[in-house]
Amino acid sequence: MPVPNPTMPVKGAGTTLWVYKGSGDPYANPLSDVDWSRLAKVKDLTPGELTAESYDDSYLDDEDADWTATGQGQKSAGDTSFTLAWMPGEQGQQALLAWFNEGDTRAYKIRFPNGTVDVFRGWVSSIGKAVTAKEVITRTVKVTNVGRPSMAEDRSTVTAATGMTVTPASTSVVKGQSTTLTVAFQPEGVTDKSFRAVSADKTKATVSVSGMTITVNGVAAGKVNIPVVSGNGEFAAVAEITVTAS
């Protein structure tokens, strides 16, 4: 994915759609993909249009009382519509149907190819299919938005990462005990500090993440790599862990 750059024009290819599955504030760090579930095979997407109603603001004693005067009234984020390749066995599309059946308000975000995002909240107002003879069957969805969205323009100042490190690069841990690794991004004020960490061999060590710290738990003696990848996939680092018997 390109480094976020909100100052350059960008085409729509590469735009992705995500639904929030966490319990926190979806607006807190929208550039992070932690607690977000991506919907696959998006064919087209039309974000909600911001509109405002008008109200009559004319008075009998206006200087130009014979001319209509209006003011901006209640605002709306409209409806977001999108089309997916229909895959009834795919977990994300099953969750979409559950979202419609439950009728609750959920957050979702649109990540654009330049790395910026729009975040909306809404409920699924329609869900259907389009079936043609010569093209794949598609799932059509419309979400009616609720409240004020968080737009990419609200976060126009983006500090992109230039690097990522994991320290220490190698260390040891006794079987049954744990050690920690620290992830850092450069420069210090990076906007998106999200990352993913896994154990290359869970029979030897397992990992858990809290903030910028990775906790490695020793399971069995041997060597194991802990690959760490930045949230946007631009940077990667590997820490080597030696698990000792005692």
Swiss-Prot record:
One biological process term in Gene Ontology: viral tail assembly
Big-1 domain: residues covered: 204-246
Subcellular location: Virion; Host cytoplasm
A cellular component annotation (GO) from this entry: virus tail, tube
Source domain of life: Viruses
Alphabetically ordered keywords of this record: Host cytoplasm, Viral genome ejection through host cell envelope, Viral long flexible tail ejection system, Viral penetration into host cytoplasm, Viral release from host cell, Viral tail assembly, Viral tail protein, Viral tail tube protein, Virion, Virus entry into host cell
Keyword Ion transport set for record: no
Chain ranges of the BIG2 domain: 161-239
Assembly with partners or alone: Multimerizes into a structure formed by 32 hexameric rings stacked on phage baseplate gpM and gpL. Does not multimerize in solution without the tail initiation complex. Soluble major tail protein interacts with tail assembly protein GT during tail assembly.
Function text: Forms the phage's tail tube composed of 32 hexameric disks. When it encounters the appropriate initiation complex gpM and gpL, it assembles in hexameric rings that stack on top of each others. Multimerization ceases when the correct tail length is achieved through a mechanism dependent on tail terminator protein.
Protein name as it appears in the record: Tail tube protein
Underlying gene: V
